[in-house]
Regions:
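Phosphate-handling active-site elements
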Residues: 44-49, 77-87, 111, 220
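Acyltransferase
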Residues: 197-262
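DPxDG-like acidic metal-binding loop motif
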Residues: 55-89
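N-terminal beta-alpha supersecondary unit
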Residues: 1-58, 260
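Conserved hydrophobic/aromatic positions in well-ordered beta-strands
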Residues: 2-4, 142-146, 228
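Surface "functional belts" at beta-alpha junctions
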Residues: 12-16, 28, 83-203, 234
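Residues at secondary-structure transition points
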Residues: 24-32, 63, 67, 71, ...
Length: 262
């Protein structure tokens, strides 16, 4: 979760990250989202009602975490009367790659200073193809294919879910980036993809969704917050359990909103 100040609603606006919270615990999404939101607001010294927008990743990604994030964003948006927007989660990966390669630094997210070195030997020129991948488990990857252009990048295909061995070759040059690329580097290299920074666990992070939103322009964001699951869950979640998870996320968000009012 990240809280940022974006200087303008037009495309290419500058921004600064005011607060950032993450957890590596993949089983506590519903429990931590509300407290993280409260902590971020406290760090930045703002109220929820002062926000101009809430942005949530819409996947593809793990079912439980995706539900918790979207439900929390919707609940907070309702409680604070703030518009909620959705963006494909893989956008964070392409934004991290392109912004780092272009600027030679990570800019407003400077803690990722190694981003530019990831492309030191990869000439990420205009018209290059960039494939970003995350781990979908079941020996599959979530992927999206982009083309680098003067504005940054444009989506060519995706999101998709499939074994890495089924991904079609890219153009010339073509690069693969993200944790999924490192997991299945051999299969991708057989199809002509150059693997970038495969030694590091490069995952989507909230601050790069913020960067992507600033690049696109807040006024151009999508109001569609529907989850992009792409496939059925590994285990069918009972309706009662699903309702309980959604209720927990909504309660946590409502509690955060109430605490800020007090």
């Amino acid at each position: 979760m990240a809280l940022a100040r974006v200087h303008g609603s037009e495309a290419g606006a500058s921004f600064e990250i005011l607060a950032r919270y993450e957890s590596e615990d993949t089983r506590s999404h519903a429990e931590v989202m509300g407290p993280y939101a409260q902590a971020a607001l406290q760090d930045a010294g703002v109220r929820g009602e002062d926000l101009d927008a809430i942005l949530t990743g819409t996947g593809p990604g793990p079912f439980t975490g995706l539900r918790a994030g979207i439900v929390t964003a919707r609940a907070l948006g309702f409680a604070w009367s703030v518009p909620v927007y959705g963006m494909m989660s893989l956008t964070a990966l392409v934004e991290r790659a392109v912004s780092g390669a272009a600027a030679g630094e990570a800019g407003a997210v400077a803690e990722e200073e190694n981003v530019e070195r990831a492309f030191a030997s990869a000439d990420l020129v205009e018209d290059a193809e960039l494939l970003v991948l995350s781990d979908a488990r079941r020996r599959e990857v979530y992927s999206a294919r982009y083309r680098v252009n003067a504005e940054g990048y444009s989506l060519v295909d995706g999101p998709n879910v499939c074994p890495a061995s089924e991904i079609l070759p890219g153009g010339d040059p073509s690069y693969a980036y993200g944790y999924g690329a490192g997991l299945y580097s051999e299969a991708l290299e057989e199809h002509g993809w150059t693997i970038v920074d495969s030694a590091r666990q490069v995952h989507p992070h909230a601050e790069y969704l913020v960067a992507a939103a600033a690049r696109l322009g807040v006024e151009n964001l999508s109001e569609d917050t529907s989850a992009q699951y792409l496939r059925d869950s590994d285990a069918k979640v009972p309706a009662a359990m699903l309702a309980r998870q959604q209720k927990q996320a909504a309660q946590a968000a409502a509690q955060t909103a109430a605490q800020k009012e007090n």
